[in-house]
């Protein structure tokens, strides 16, 4: 249901972008994301999936005629809007899901996934905090999942630390 709701607003915003109109995200969409973030009964892995915006490729499948520039612009704008609207919630969930040691267990995998989803949104939020969180996670990562999530977040959000992270990773 959440993905269907998102698809509707993504299509609407791609059309608005193409017409030079301002993009919109109704309050109830952010509220739905907030409810997922704060619901302690949802498996963290499932929450991470629900909170992840569709990829540009998935969005392109919604259209007969594909406008990649509009799709990327809308996806980034929605990410930034959600990052701003839910900054406190993303940060709280990010911090609450820090693990002491790497273990290959379902519960830990889910927490890592949710934490990394939150990091990606946080990367599109307040720049100084984003740069600090991403750099810290990259340097403290004891597994490839967390290191790559930090690297991907820095690149996607075009953070100042992205070049250093990319050089360190190669």
Task: State the predicted function of each range.
Residues 2-167:
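Long, ordered, helix-rich scaffold segments
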């Amino acid at each position: 249901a959440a993905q269907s709701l998102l698809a509707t607003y993504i299509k609407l915003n791609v059309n608005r972008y193409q017409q030079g109109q301002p993009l919109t995200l109704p309050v109830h969409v952010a509220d739905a994301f907030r409810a997922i973030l704060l619901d302690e009964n949802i498996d963290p892995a499932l929450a991470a999936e629900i909170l992840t915006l569709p990829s540009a490729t998935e969005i392109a499948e919604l259209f007969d005629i594909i406008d990649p520039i509009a799709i990327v612009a809308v996806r980034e704008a929605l990410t930034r809007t959600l990052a701003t609207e839910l900054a406190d919630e993303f940060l709280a969930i990010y911090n609450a899901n820090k693990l002491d040691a790497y273990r290959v267990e379902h519960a830990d995998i889910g927490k890592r996934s949710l934490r990394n989803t939150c990091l990606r949104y946080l990367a599109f939020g307040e720049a100084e905090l984003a740069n600090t969180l991403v750099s810290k996670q990259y340097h403290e990562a004891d597994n490839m999942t967390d290191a790559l999530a930090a690297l991907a977040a820095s690149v996607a959000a075009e953070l100042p630390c992205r070049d250093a992270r990319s050089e360190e990773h190669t």
